[in-house]
Amino acid sequence: MKFLAFGLIYFHFCILNRCEYITSSTIQKCYNSSNEPNNCSQKAVIVLSLENGQIANTEQVVATLNQLSDSGVNKQLQNSFIFEVTKSPVTALFPLIYLQDFNSQPLEQVIATTLFSCKDGFYDSSPTCKFQYDSKGQKILDSQGYCCYCSLSDILGMGNDLSRGKVCYALNLGAGSATAHCLKFSPLWYSAFKIQQYQLYFEVNINIYTVDSQNQKNLKQTLKLSTSNPTMKSSDNSTISKIIGTFTPTQPPADLSSYYLVKPSFPATDPRVLQGISSWMFVDKTMFTLDGTQCNKIGVSYSGFRQQSSSCSQPVGSCLQNQLENLYQSDLILLSQNKQPKYLLESQGNFNQVQFQGQTILQQGLSGSASTLITIEIDAAQIKFVTNLGIGCISQCSINNFESHSGNGKLVALVQNQGNYSAEFVLGFNCSSNVQPIQGQKLFLTANQLYNFNCSVSVNSDISAINNNCTINLYDAIGNQLDSKNILFNTTSTNHTSNQGNNTGQQQSSQEYKSSQSCSDKCSSFWSFWCYFSAGCIKEAFKSIASIAGVASALALVIFLAKNGYLVPIIRFLCCCCCKSKKKENEKNKDKTDKKSIQESCSYDRSCCSHSISQSYQVENKNKYKRSKIQRSFSSESCQDKSKKIINELSNLEETFEANKLYANIDKNSSIFEYFGFKKSFTFILYERNDILFLPQNSTILDMIGALQPQKGSYLAQKFLEIVNKNALKVVSTSPLYLLIE
């Protein structure tokens, strides 16, 4: 077995004309196969770490074999080998599986009609909305829409509920008393795709050159590695190249497992279809209804529209919210405000559509580090590793002012390679403590290339801050700082909002959703007995008919009573009974209060009545009804006669004192004489304590008080005034009215 002796292996790091050499070692490798047992040869193994996005000549491996040792004799080789290795950008490939098509914007058409002409039955020959037919010419179930009718209360002018798409007028049975509601679809349709698990993909190209004695470089062959073909061998078996593995990207691909990809598909001439990938969207799976039975979801069908709960008491379009057109337009508004969209592809990263192995693939370009290890096994003696160190600068950089936690902060920087070679650069970031760390980025720029770098910026605090700062540093491939810029920016405090009330923390009442439709859900009005019949709700239909018959009978009875003159007397009788009952109760309560007030407030010492003699007598109601016992105690006949006289005179006011009941009694503990009169026009109460008569204040008594002044008061008041003057009663107080017996 022969062993080949190697010289030193050199790695060259070249910046223009300046080079730096680092020594390396070699290894021995033996291959044992059944064809050539114990066939060992000396191999030089080069292990390279290739970064994401490297371009031609950014990283170059030059291997030169210049001498061998054979039986202790060193021999110089005339030809050498050169290997150039490049790596394509790392991308994530998302296979797509077609799901189904969805309309961009379903619309509701409202047709005004009458109670008797609106038709929505499946077996109607010509329903108001017309039938839609499938590709086989069969009627599509529920494509005939549905009808909404003005209820009986609306026709009678008593309805106040929301009516879908119609304005109901009293006594209107013609046009406008019913409406037909039809589901129509807009011309634009989207195709939806399931998104499969991503796979990382990149390619590594290895160019093998031979260099002759005239130092001419000739391409010998090219090896092309990829994630699909990780191992390749040269045609002369002198070189073997392998992909060992790829490190997990520092910025991994987006997680799209909970989304569908939707893209405008037809008509092909639609402007949005022609826009291409810029109008594609990622939409959460929960926003779709695949069977079309759910309202306010993408994919709502004729059945979902027609069978919606309480349809005729909902606003027009209530079942057709949150459609693809709504999502697209909302993102356009966000973009116009320089905000991040929610559904367009750029909300998740940088995406493109590619055809890969005959399959439609969604491709996402990855930024950040994604190193790949490869090995190249060669029969070489000396290896040079060349890395171009670029000269660059940061020409512009800025961070916009933004709201904390809004996700709208953005850093923009222009980086230029000022050298004559393609080179690797590194951007590093050092920001103030309240700014979330920004991940460093590796850039691979061609000669004199100007690159626009941007990334998101966020802060950790909810409160506003002035003069936040970030420093951007530009380094070359081995960490030499080439340029540095400092950026100042401001943030405003987080604007807290809530959809559950006017302010954060407010709560609205919870809503309960039914999983199945009841009869009341199917028919919007209790009076729509024809709706109950059509829905199979027989019991509710008969209840509705009985209620309508009851209301009609009551109306007929009222009309009959009014026509024959019975209605007004009945109403007066009922009102009179009600008012009397309430009036008696109020007077009883008021009497007790007035009586107590007199007992507490009256302080007169004069007395024409004492408690030494007790006598009983009766006063007969002049209007023929009842007798009541009056128990009085008097010390003199004149006091008794005078009080009795006053009572009789008050009772003789026949014009107004048409009492149904008169009674009087004496409270033995307080010596209060009470005179009650229950009249049609007012309640009259007269108290006597010692020598004071009291009349509770009301409208009639006020009228009497007014009669104490000349030329004022009603007829009743004038009569009352005559009694006051005739019996020489002295007015002590007018509010309430106190009369003193002289």
Swiss-Prot record:
One of its GO terms (cellular component) is cell-cell junction. Residues 152-179 are annotated as: Important for membrane fusion. This is Hapless 2. Pfam families: HAP2-GCS1 (PF10699). During fertilization, required for the formation of intercellular membrane pores and subsequent exchange of gametic pronuclei between cells. Probably initiates the formation of intercellular membrane pores by inserting part of its extracellular domain into the cell membrane of the adjoining cell in the mating pair. Mating requires the presence of HAP2 on at least one of the two cells. Mating efficiency is high when HAP2 is present on both cells, and is strongly reduced when HAP2 is present on only one of the two cells. The keyword Transmembrane helix applies. It comes from the Eukaryota. Residues 20-540 are extracellular. It is found in: Cell membrane; Cell junction. It is a single-pass type I membrane protein.
